[in-house]
Design a protein with these regions (language model features):
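Sec-dependent bacterial lipoprotein signal peptides
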Residues: 1-21
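Secreted, cysteine-rich disulfide-bonded mini-domains of extracellular proteins
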Residues: 22-110
Length: 110
């Protein structure tokens, strides 16, 4: 293999690592605009520092990382799963007593 081809392959591999799956947004990430959350989610700006999520997840499901939480009959959102408070980002708590799956939320769920 020529050294030029080797350089191209190494460069392509590094670019894939830098801009590939390791940099994709996950449920619960902070955001400012919808594009911060990739193509499967949107930025819920009512949450502190934004929150990447999917609305109506009972119908369409959540991305690989996330749990679907029903807040009432008409509202369900993909939320960041947790076990303890330190699993959540700053300013968020792990809600453990609202539905079957603990999740990170800015305030205790009603």
């Amino acid at each position: 293999m020529s050294s030029r081809l080797s350089i191209v392959l190494v460069t392509a591999t590094l670019a894939a690592l830098l801009f590939g799956t390791g940099c994709q947004a996950v449920v619960g990430d902070a955001c400012e605009i919808n594009t911060d959350c990739g193509t499967e989610m949107y930025c819920e700006r009512s949450m502190p520092e934004g929150y990447c999520t999917v609305k109506s997840c009972e119908v369409i499901g959540c991305p690989d990382y996330g749990v679907c939480v029903s807040f009432d009959l008409d509202q369900s959102y993909c939320m960041d799963p947790c076990e303890i408070a330190t699993d959540c980002r700053d300013g968020y708590v792990c809600v453990t007593d609202f539905g079957p799956h603990p999740f990170c939320n800015a305030v205790e769920a009603p």
